[in-house]
C-alpha cells in the first residue's frame, strides 16, 4: 500500500476526536440540523482525509439514500457518511456531501454549538 498524504486545513477546523486528523472547516458546513443514531451531526460540502466504505442503500428520516460510510485516514475510525445518491428529488442537494457525527469529531462546535438544539433531517 502507498503512503497516505494528509491535507492540513487552516481556519476553524473540525478534527477526528481520536487522532486529531483534520477533516473539514466551518466554512464547509451546509447544515447543522442533522441527526444520527448517537446525536447531532453536521452536513459538510467538503471533507478531507477520509476513505470510503462500500455503497449501500440506507433508509433515513428523509427517505432512501445510497451512501458510503467515511473513515478517518489517520486512525480508521468511522466518522460519518457520504451521500452518493438520493432517491427523492427534494433530497438531491445532499449528493456528494458528507455528514460528520459530532460525538466523533472536535472543533469549533465544542465551544457553543452544542448548546442549541437542531432539527431532524
Swiss-Prot record:
Keyword entries, A-Z: Metal-binding, Zinc
Residues covered by the Yippee domain: 12-109
InterPro entries the record matches: Yippee, Yippee/Mis18/Cereblon, Yippee_fam
PROSITE patterns in the cross-refs: YIPPEE
Top-level taxon in the UniProt lineage: Eukaryota
Binding site for Zn(2+): 16, 19, 72, 75
GO molecular function, one term: metal ion binding
Family: Belongs to the yippee family.
Protein name: Protein yippee-like At3g55890
Organism of derivation: Arabidopsis thaliana
Taxonomy of the source species: Eukaryota, Viridiplantae, Streptophyta, Embryophyta, Tracheophyta
